[in-house]
Structures are given as C-alpha cells and as structure tokens.
Amino acid sequence: MGGFQRGKYGTMAEGRSEDNLSATPPALRIILVGKTGCGKSATGNSILGQPVFESKLRAQSVTRTCQVKTGTWNGRKVLVVDTPSIFESQADTQELYKNIGDCYLLSAPGPHVLLLVIQLGRFTAQDTVAIRKVKEVFGTGAMRHVVILFTHKEDLGGQALDDYVANTDNCSLKDLVRECERRYCAFNNWGSVEEQRQQQAELLAVIERLGREREGSFHSNDLFLDAQLLQRTGAGACQEDYRQYQAKVEWQVEKHKQELRENESNWAYKALLRVKHLMLLHYEIFVFLLLCSILFFIIFLFIFHYI
C-alpha cells in the first residue's frame, strides 16, 4: 500500500469543484463527525500520517472551528475536514450555524465519506444524539455515505472487530451498523507507524467498497451547491453574499429537521398499521379457534348423551 504523504494546509478559499474531464482524479473528501471527545482530530492525524490537527485527551473539544488538511494516497489527493462541537445536544446559535456553513464550504461540492468516529466499548446516548445531528446537518441521505470508525482498537485485545460487532449487546449500536450497511473499521491512533499504515489500508478498503457501491458519487444537496458557488466567487464575495449564504444554512438545517420528523412520523404510522394488522390477524385466529372449541364441545356432549 502507498502511504499518506503530508500535503499543504487547506483553507476555505482553496476548495475546487469536481472536473470529470480532468485526467487527475478528484480529491477524496472525508468529513470527521461524532460527539466531542471521541477522537476525531487524532483520527484525522492517523489518516494523513501527520499531527496536523491539534489533539489532546480532554472531555471538552479542542477543535473550535472547522479545519481542513490535505495529503495524498497512491497519487490521489485526500482532503480531511475536522469538525468542532456541531453534533451535540445544544441550542442552535449563530456560532453553530457558522461552523456548519464552514463545514459545507470546506467540503464542497460534498463529501465522499462521513467518517463517524466512536470510541470502542463506549457507545452512549451522546453518540445517538450525534448521529441524529449528522442527519439534521447533512440530511438523512447522508447515512448512505457514513463509515463507522471505532477508536481505541487496542482495547480489542486479540478479539476480531467483526466478532465484537456481532456479539455486542448494545441494540443501538447494532441498529447503527445495520443502517450503515456494515461499513466499519477500527484505529489505534497511538499505534506504531506500521500499524497505522495497515489501519489506513483497512479504512481505504472500506471507502473503496463504498465508492463502488455508490458508483463514485458523493453526498450533496442544495447547500453544498451554494457553498461551491460561494467558493468560486472567492475574494470577490462580499458580506452580503456571506449573509445570504448563512441564511441558507439555517434554512437547510431546519428543512433537514422537518424531513427527519416526517420520516419518523411515517415510520411510526407504518409500525402502528403493522401492529393493527397483527392484532386483526390474531383476532381472526382466536375467533376461529373459539368456534372450533365450541363445535368440539357440542360434538362431545352429543356423543356422551347417546352412549
């Protein structure tokens, strides 16, 4: 495997649109998502093979703003976006929307992979909230591009990751793995150089499988197109352009929230219909058995009477 090589630091103004006519393959765009303290920044460093993101063992987020760093893998540019606390259960603020807008700008025209970082053995209610926030920020369709990355791989000991996932008693984690179509891998972010190279290869194998399944497409929506347009404007963009863009960010997130609520309502309605159908089916079976019992009892009395 060709390892990652350190590339230049990216900025919001450096994003380029995809060019399918170019001989150079488009950059592989990865957004790191997950709850605060799960190891997103350290994972980004492991992917790029360099300590380009600030990473410390803290309960609170070290990353305050969205950041993008780049590298190459087998000649292909890799772009990794690290995110601050935008996937937490918190009130919607202008700072939150600004960070979401920056995330879109840095990853336009859209990510090939949303890398959901989860600490091995610590899948909690906060992780469940983070997953819902991912859907609110990027839309429910974003889950088609989610890859789960478990940190603290060293805690597996000699156990295979597949066995850990198959044998977990955490129903929420099982549902997540099923929703992500079993796309997952694990990292020891403090492993040796050789171990990290092997982890890079395992992750990229999962990403390549996802690419084949999605025919090379990436996740996008109207806001990513707006972000790409603002990128092209570059230095020519004025304050009014940014103000309008931020208003679109708020509108898009609210739209995603509404779609999520509607999907949940539809799911609940369909579940209720299934329950009613089962109750009706069981009721018919109960009536049939009751009539059979009565008929059997009458026959028994008739036979008993004439014996």
Swiss-Prot record:
In what tissue types does this protein appear?
Widely expressed with high levels in lymph node and spleen. High expression found in T lymphocytes, including CD4 and CD8-positive T-cells, and monocytes. Very low expression levels in B-lymphocytes.
Q: AIG1-type G domain spans which residues?
A: 25-228
PROSITE patterns, per the entry: G_AIG1
Task: Mark the transmembrane ranges.
Answer: 285-305
Principal localisation: membrane
Q: Keyword set for this entry?
A: Endosome, GTP-binding, Lysosome, Membrane, Nucleotide-binding, Transmembrane, Transmembrane helix
Q: How does it sit in the membrane?
A: Single-pass type IV membrane protein
Q: What GO CC annotations are associated with the protein? A: lysosomal membrane; multivesicular body membrane
Q: Which InterPro entries match?
A: G_AIG1 (IPR006703), GIMA/IAN/Toc (IPR045058), P-loop_NTPase (IPR027417)
Q: Which residues lie on this side of the membrane: Lumenal?
A: 306-307
Q: Which residues bind GTP?
A: 34-42, 55, 152-154, 189
Q: Give the location in the cell.
A: Lysosome membrane; Endosome, Multivesicular body membrane; Endosome membrane
Looking at the keywords, is Nucleotide-binding present?
A: yes
Enumerate the Cytoplasmic topological stretches. 1-284
Associated disease: Portal hypertension, non-cirrhotic, 2: An autosomal recessive disorder characterized by portal hypertension associated with hepatosplenomegaly, in absence of cirrhosis. Portal hypertension is defined by a portal venous system pressure that is at least 5 mm Hg higher than the pressure in the inferior vena cava. High pressure in the portal venous system leads to shunting of blood through vessels that are poorly suited to carrying large blood volumes, resulting in collateral circulation and splenomegaly.
Question: What's this protein's family per the entry?
Answer: Belongs to the TRAFAC class TrmE-Era-EngA-EngB-Septin-like GTPase superfamily. AIG1/Toc34/Toc159-like paraseptin GTPase family. IAN subfamily.
Q: How does it assemble?
A: Interacts with BAD, BAK1, BAX, BCL2, BCL2L1/Bcl-xL and BCL2L11/BimEL. The interaction with BAX is increased, when cells initiate apoptosis upon IL2 withdrawal. Also interacts with BCL2. Forms a complex with BCL2L1 or MCL1 and HSPA8/HSC70; the interaction between HSPA8 and BCL2L1 or MCL1 is impaired in the absence of GIMAP5. May interact (via N-terminus) with microtubules.
Its biological purpose: Plays a role in T lymphocyte development and the optimal generation of CD4/CD8 double-positive thymocytes. Inhibitor of GSK3A, possibly by sequestering GSK3A in cytoplasmic vesicles and impairing its translocation to the nucleus. Consequently, impairs GSK3A-dependent transcriptional program and regulation of the DNA damage response occurring during T cells proliferation. Required for the survival of peripheral T cells, natural killer (NK) and NK T-cell development and the maintenance of normal liver function. May promote the survival of mature T lymphocytes upon cytokine withdrawal.
UniProt-recorded name of the protein:
GTPase IMAP family member 5
